[in-house]
Amino acid sequence: MKVAVLGAGRVGGAMALDLARDSGFQVTVVDLTPEALKPLEGVPNLSLMEADLSDQEAVRRVMADQDLGVGAVPGFMGFRTLQAILEAGRPAVDIAFFPEDPFLLDGLAKAQGLVAIVDAGIAPGCSNLILGRLEELMSETTRFECVVGGLPVVR
């Protein structure tokens, strides 16, 4: 399966490395800046591509020969990037946590028979799965609090 990871920051880069460890995936990491891609040079099963992911047409071109798009761009770019992945006719998993309502893209995805999984990060994302599991196991959940820090600081 050909997977494009859109965004090579700390989270996107880590996801790309994890995916590249599985020989079932051919991973392409895409970012605007060579500096973001440089730490991923020479990783087996991983190719690098420079592209402006704020340009929806560029995203559609990137996705033309991919099977799955993984959105790992900053939140302010997330909605439009996800939209472009779907417009390219590809399913998507997104961790951007953008402010727009993802259900605005529901019709676009359904019209093409595509799946789009949004908010698939730590929180939201894993926290939602944990809460869902607790709901299954417990008779009643009255409160769930999840406290999550931001991205780690490189020192």
Language-model segment annotations:
Residues 43-55:
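Rossmann-fold cofactor-recognition segment
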